[in-house]
């Protein structure tokens, strides 16, 4: 497949003019891409773990929805560490993270941004949230996340499952939260370019909003650049 797509990239056929994107884009649905020299880059991991409902107070190396004190500049909602992942756990060794990855966003605005939400992370748990812009260019928007919604989000029972699932488990189900493997893209697959180095980010996890808060829709996809230690979070829904 790589040889064929590289040939089409270097020598476009006449029918290319009728396509919206280059044929090479379709490699991404298989979880990989390549550069102009033909060097292949994997965009996902070949191991998939589910997030399952655990017992109250159960220890877990992956936490969804940890409360924060700071607030969103757009809507005033409390920010949230939507994913906190300790790569030192034996189950997560496949990620190649020698510490903690934290993904931070506004649970109200992350679906209304122009592009993904970004933050940098340090392996000791530190976070720096990048500035963001609302999709319509407005400076402010209403907050639709009620206090009881935020409490539901940050007190959810999910913990990392004890055993891996099939590689395409996350892609085949629209009601599961997963780490690794393939995503169930609501729309088209979308691998974000790292804002620092420009390389495509690697898919890390997906979170279904309706598993955390009643009355919500869509999926949050979390990707990261291991070299630059930057995380992206993007929302899709029907």
Region locations from a protein language model:
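Preference for intrinsically disordered or flexible, low-complexity segments
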Residues: 1-238
